[in-house]
Amino acid sequence: MPTDVTTAKPPSGPVMDGLPWERRRWAIAAIFTALTMASLDTAIANIALPAIATDLHVSPADAVWVVNVYQIALVATLLPLGALGEIVGHERIYLGGLLLFTLASLGCAMAWSLDSLLVARTLQGLGASGVMSVNTALVRFIYPSRMVGRGFGHNALVVATAFTLGPTIASGILAIGHWPWLFAINLPFGIIAMLIGLKTLPPTPRAVHRFDFFGAVLAAGCLGLFIIGIGSAAHKASPPLVVVALIASLVLGWILMRRHADHPAPMLPIDLFRRPVFALSTATAVCSFAVQGLAFVSLPFYFEEVLLRSQVETGFFMTPWPLVVAIMAPIGGRLSDRYPAGILGGLGLALLAVGMALLAVLPATPGVANIVWRMAICGLGFGFFQTPNMRALMSSAPPGRSGSASGIVATARLTGQTIGAALAALCFSLAGHQGAALALALGAGFAAVGSVMSFLRMAVSR
C-alpha cells in the first residue's frame, strides 16, 4: 500500500452544471481543436513515413518508430495523467499537455536526424496524452448534465472526422511541401487553442489525496510494455521479446493492483471496475475498437491485393465507415440523453457484427456499391454504439473520478485498436490472402460479444 496517501475526502472545488452558452462554445472550440490535432497526428505520420525514411536516410523499419514512440508515450501515460487531473484540475493537465504538444510539434518540424525526431515525437505523445486523458472529463463539466450525451457525441464526431480526413490532409500537405510541415501546421492551432482555453475552461473539482508517483511509473510500465508486446507480435518480432514484454506487463499490473488495493483513488481504477456498468462499458469499448483495428488493417490489403484496386479506390472504399460514424455521433449523443446505453449500444454492435460478416463474405468480384453499403452498415453500427457507451462509462463514475474514467475511455480505444491490428497481422500470417476474410469474421465475433455485454448492462445496477 502506498505511503503517500492522505485520508480520503470528497473532492473539493466548484460544483456546477455546465457553463453558460457563450463561454461553453469557446471552451468547446478549445478542447476540440486540441483533440483534432492529437487525433490527426496519430494518423498522418503513417503517410509521411516513406518521405521521412528517405529524407533522414534510414530504413523503413527504423522509420516506423516515429509512429511507435508516439503511441507508446501516449498510451503509457493516459491513466497517470487522468489521475493527476483529479488532484490538480483537469483544465491544468489539458493546458500543460497542449503546451507540450505544440512545442514538441515545433521540435518535430525542426528535427535534423531520426534520433532528434524520435525525442520530439515522444514528447509530442506525452502532450497528446495530456489532452486525451482529460478530454471527456472536461466535456462532463462544460456541458449541462441534460446535454452531456450531446457533448460526448460532438467529441466522437471530432475524432471520427479527424480519422477520416487525416490521410487526405497529410497527402495534400505532402503534395505541396515537405514532411516537416505536417508537424509545423500544429503551431498556430495549438497557440490559439491554448489562449482560448486559458480564458474559458472551467475549474474542475480537486480530490484531496496525493499523487502516487511510484504507482504512475507502474501504470506507465504496465501499459507501455503491453503496447510494445502486442505491437511486436503484429510486426512478427522474435517470440521471446513478445513473451517477455507481455509477462512484464502482467507482473507490473499485478503489483499495481496490490499496491492500490486500499487506495481511495487508485491509478488503475479498480474502484470503478467494481461498478458493473463501468466494467461492461469498458469491455464493450475494447471489443468495438478491436473490430475497428481488425477492419482498418485488413481491408486495405484485401482491396488492393485481392480485388486489385488502386490506392485511390481503396481510400474511397474506406471512407463510408468513418463518414457515417461522423454523421451518427451527434445523433447517438442526443438519443443517449433519452434512452438506455445498454439498448443503443447493443443494437449498434449487433449491426456492426452484421456489417463485418457481410464484408467477410463479399463475392469474388464485388461492384463498388456492393462494398460501399456494407462499409456504411459498419459505420452506422459503430456510430450508434460509440457515443451512448461513452456517456454510460463516464456517467457511471462519480464526478471526482472523472479523470480516471476519461483516461480509461482513451486507453480502451487505443488498446482495442492495437489488439485488433495485431490479430489482423496474425490472420494474414495464418491464412495468407484469405487473412482478410478471417480477420473480418473475427471482427464480427468481437462485435457480437460486445453486443451481448452491452445488453447485459440492462440487467445490472449502476
Where in the sequence are the language-model features?
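Extracellular/periplasmic helix-loop-helix junction of adjacent transmembrane segments
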Residues: A48-T77, S116, L307, V312-F317
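Helix-breaking motifs and short loop linkers at transmembrane-helix boundaries and internal kinks
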Residues: D55-H57, G89, M110-S116, G177-H178, ...
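Hydrophobic/small/kink-forming positions within alpha-helical transmembrane segments
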Residues: V75-A76, L106, A160, T164, ...
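Helix-loop-helix hairpins in multi-pass membrane proteins, especially solute transporters
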Residues: A83-F214
